[in-house]
Every structure is written in C-alpha cells, then in structure tokens.
C-alpha cells in the first residue's frame, strides 16, 4: 500500500519533515517514491508548510492513503478544497 506520510530530517532538537509518498513497509526515513512538500513544526519561517497540491491530489486519486498527521497538513494546504466542491 502506498502512503503519504512525514519523514523526519533536520538536526537534533530541530525537526523538519518532508511530506513524502512511500510504500507503507518502508522505514520512516527510508527511500520514498516522491517528495510532495515539507513541514516545519516550529514555524521558524513564513513558509512553514509547503505542499505541491497538484501532485498530492494525483497520489490521492490513485489510492495513496495519508496518515492522520499528513491528512491534517494536506487539509491546511488546501488539497481537499477543490475535491469537496466537485463532489457537491
């Protein structure tokens, strides 16, 4: 199964996360299929969340399952807004 989840990078006590598409059996920080964004939980920069919305929608359309945290971040980035309007 393909998942959209967070992969940690950055230094000790200063986490940053890549939002990646990966096989569910891979390690958290292991090889991934595609990087679709990044997230800075400390919000140290104005662009603390960046997501390639088009690629995220593509991966969701082909069946990728986001984790709870990834789903929350994708929702904040506006990935689900267009889909909700199309279905209504």
UniProtKB/Swiss-Prot annotation:
Keywords: Ribonucleoprotein, Ribosomal protein. GO terms for molecular function: structural constituent of ribosome. GO terms for biological process: translation. One of its GO terms (cellular component) is small ribosomal subunit. The keyword Ribonucleoprotein applies. InterPro entries: Ribosomal_bS16 (IPR000307), Ribosomal_bS16_dom_sf (IPR023803). It holds the Pfam family Ribosomal_S16. Binds to the lower part of the body of the 30S subunit, where it stabilizes two of its domains. Part of the 30S ribosomal subunit. Belongs to the bacterial ribosomal protein bS16 family. PANTHER family: 30S RIBOSOMAL PROTEIN S16, SMALL RIBOSOMAL SUBUNIT PROTEIN BS16M. This is Small ribosomal subunit protein bS16. It comes from Thermus thermophilus (strain ATCC 27634 / DSM 579 / HB8).
């Amino acid at each position: 199964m393909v998942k959209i989840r967070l992969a940690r990078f950055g230094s000790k006590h200063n986490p940053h996360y890549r939002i990646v598409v990966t096989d569910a059996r891979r390690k958290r920080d292991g090889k991934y299929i595609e990087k679709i964004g990044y997230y800075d939980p400390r919000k140290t920069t104005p662009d603390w969340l960046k997501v390639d919305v088009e690629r995220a929608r593509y991966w969701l359309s082909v069946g990728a399952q986001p984790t709870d945290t990834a789903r929350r971040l994708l929702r904040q980035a506006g990935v689900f807004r267009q889909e909700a309007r199309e279905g209504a």
